[in-house]
Amino acid sequence: MEQEQDTPWTQSTGHINIQKKGNGQQTRKPERPNSTQLMDHYLRTMSQVDMHRQTASWKPWPSLKNPTQESLKTRVLKRWKLFNKQGWTS
């Protein structure tokens, strides 16, 4: 008889139903999540993705239509100096 493996859903949320077989062994059978549990799981996952996206992205510079390499370098250096003054707690 094939034993069911935990899915990422059951590992992350712990919705496990323990059942006993006829020979006394315990099997772990994932419960079917309801819509509230699925929505909660989805929202937690998406908020983690959104936090990562915010920390990994740069703000666009819409004021620069045709930037030259020198103007970009100046702008980046100004932002870098400002960032260093504020420190990592900004």
From Swiss-Prot:
Q: Which UniProt keywords apply?
A: Apoptosis, Host cytoplasm, Host membrane, Host mitochondrion, Host mitochondrion inner membrane, Host nucleus, Host-virus interaction, Inhibition of host innate immune response by virus, Inhibition of host MAVS by virus, Inhibition of host RLR pathway by virus, Membrane, Modulation of host cell apoptosis by virus, Viral immunoevasion
Q: Where in the cell is it found?
A: Host mitochondrion inner membrane; Host nucleus; Host cytoplasm, Host cytosol
| Superkingdom of origin | Viruses
Q: Where is this site: Low pathogenicity?
A: 66
The cellular component terms of Gene Ontology attached to this UniProt record, alphabetical and capped at eight, are: host cell cytosol; host cell mitochondrial inner membrane; host cell nucleus; membrane
Q: Does the keyword GTP-binding feature in the UniProt annotation?
A: no
The family database entries (InterPro entries) matched by this protein are listed as: Flu_proapoptotic_PB1-F2 (IPR021045)
Region labeled Disordered — which residues? 1-36, 50-70
Please give the chief subcellular localization of this protein. Answer: host cell
Region labeled Mitochondrial targeting sequence — which residues?
Answer: 65-87
GO BP, one annotated term: symbiont-mediated perturbation of host apoptosis
Functionally, this protein is described as follows:
Plays an important role in promoting lung pathology in both primary viral infection and secondary bacterial infection. Promotes alteration of mitochondrial morphology, dissipation of mitochondrial membrane potential, and cell death. Alternatively, inhibits the production of interferon in the infected cell at the level of host mitochondrial antiviral signaling MAVS. Its level of expression differs greatly depending on which cell type is infected, in a manner that is independent of the levels of expression of other viral proteins. Monocytic cells are more affected than epithelial cells.
Family, similarity comment: Belongs to the influenza viruses PB1-F2 family.
Recite the other comments. Is not encoded in all strains, and seems to be dispensable for replication.
Q: How does it assemble?
A: Oligomer. Interacts with human SLC25A6/ANT3 and VDAC1. Interacts with host MAVS.
Protein name per Swiss-Prot or TrEMBL: Protein PB1-F2
Q: Which organism is it from?
A: Influenza A virus (strain A/Duck/England/1/1956 H11N6)
Classification lineage: Viruses, Riboviria, Orthornavirae, Negarnaviricota, Polyploviricotina
Please name the gene that encodes this protein: PB1
